[in-house]
Structures are given as C-alpha cells and as structure tokens.
A protein has these predicted regions:
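Core of compact, soluble alpha-helical bundle domains
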Residues: 1-129
Length: 129
C-alpha cells in the first residue's frame, strides 16, 4: 500500500473497520461504567438497554468514521438532555477515550481524529459548566 492509498482511506478503514470499532466501544464502555466518578449514569439501566446503547454507539461511530452503517438513534443533544453531564464528567470520558485508543495502539493521526470528533460533540452533550 502506498502513502497515497493510506491517505485516501476513510477513518473507518484506518481504524480497522467494524470489528475494531466494536471492540474499542466495548473497552470504552467498560471503563466508563466501572469508573466510580461517572458510573451512576448507567444506574438502573437494564442489560437490554445497555446492549441497545452499545449498538447505537457502534453504529454512530462507524457511520461518522465513513463506514457502512446507518445511525438511527437520536441526535447527541437529545440523547444526553437532562443527564446533567458536567465538564468534569466530560473530562473523565475524554480520559477513558484516550486510554482506550492507547490500549488498542491507535496511531497518532487516527487518535487525534477520533478525539477531535468527540470534542466536536461536547457542546451538544455537556450541560453543566
């Protein structure tokens, strides 16, 4: 593969495709749901609810990265409205996101693209300064 072919690949392809995004999602959700600082966001969620949310995240990320998925969930603002997500909660999310990307050895370029994409969503998700 030439350097030009690498540059022409979508982020989805460069991340390793659907299975890689699904594995990273599982890792990230495990980190978030196990962190005492933010685990209460999942308090009371049934196993079915968690599975559905996980699949929506995988589809959202796959579509956003240029992959063959169609996200059918609500927009980020509506999905997170009323959750009272704070700047501190967001910082924990970003910390775990970076740790997940590092865990999977995601190269710097792709790591920055993913984290930059997450940052672009912050205004739709964080409700408390």
């Amino acid at each position: 593969m030439t350097a030009n072919e690498t540059q022409e690949q979508s982020l989805y392809q460069r991340l390793g495709g659907y299975d890689a995004i699904a594995a990273a999602t599982d890792d990230l959700l495990g980190r978030l749901q196990g962190d005492p600082r933010i685990k209460d966001f999942w308090k009371g969620a049934s196993a079915d609810n968690r599975r559905k949310a996980r699949q929506l995240i995988v589809d959202f990320m796959t579509e956003a990265a240029g992959g063959p998925a169609y996200y059918v969930g609500r927009d980020m603002k509506t999905s997170h409205e009323g959750m009272q997500i704070s700047e501190a909660d967001w910082a924990v999310f970003m910390e775990h996101s970076a740790a997940t990307l590092d865990h999977f050895g995601v190269p710097a370029r792709e790591r920055e693209e993913v984290l930059g994409f997450f940052e672009s969503l912050k205004g739709e998700i964080v409700e408390i300064a």
